[in-house]
Regions:
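Short, well-structured N-terminal submotif of metal-dependent ribonuclease cores
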Residues: 1-38
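A secondary-structure boundary/capping signal
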Residues: 6-7, 38-39, 107-108, 124
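Residues that scaffold the ATP/ADP-binding catalytic core of kinase and kinase-like folds
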Residues: 12-14, 49, 114, 131-132
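Amphipathic coiled-coil/heptad-repeat helices and related helical stalk/stem segments
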Residues: 22-23, 61, 88-89
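PIN-domain endoribonuclease scaffold, especially VapC-family toxins
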Residues: 27-83
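Active-site neighborhoods of divalent-metal-dependent phosphate/nucleic-acid chemistry enzymes
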Residues: 70-104, 109
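Acidic, PIN/NYN-like endoribonuclease modules and their adjacent C-terminal/linker elements
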Residues: 109-132
């Protein structure tokens, strides 16, 4: 199964994971059972949030991301999707569409409200953990 994971879930898993919270378990499931799809723009946003908002050293943020995405696939988005009520979230939809992702795992209400986009279901980390 191909999955795209939004920044909200990444940050919750990497920054706030004290033990075995839902975002951490979702990220672990994606790493061990599924294939993560990403793009340069998603990676840059994750690194930016970790370094600017949470004072991670850039090397630490980049290393964590590279290790997690080692089993993933990369797509090149063009920024042409204009669907989400928050334009900053359109990159997740475009990445999912180009990767032909089965799921977009999101904690962002602007994405979740859509329910699906071009064959990709948009679900919460809890729903992802319950999915086979």
């Amino acid at each position: 199964m191909i999955v795209v994971i939004d920044t909200n879930v990444w940050i919750s898993a990497l920054q706030f994971a004290k033990g075995r919270g839902t975002p951490t378990l979702a990220l672990e499931k994606a790493m061990s059972q599924d294939v993560n799809a990403t793009c340069d723009e998603i990676d840059a946003e994750i690194v930016r949030v970790l370094t600017e908002k949470f004072s991670w050293e850039r090397h630490r943020a980049t290393s964590a991301l590279q290790m997690i995405l080692a089993r993933g696939i990369r797509v090149k988005i063009r920024g042409t999707v204009k669907v989400c009520r928050d334009p900053n979230d359109d990159m997740f939809l475009e990445c999912a569409a180009l990767a032909k992702a089965d799921l977009l795992v999101a904690g962002d209400k602007d994405l979740l409200i859509l329910g699906a986009y071009k064959g990709t279901r948009i679900i919460t980390p809890s729903e992802y953990l319950r999915a086979g």
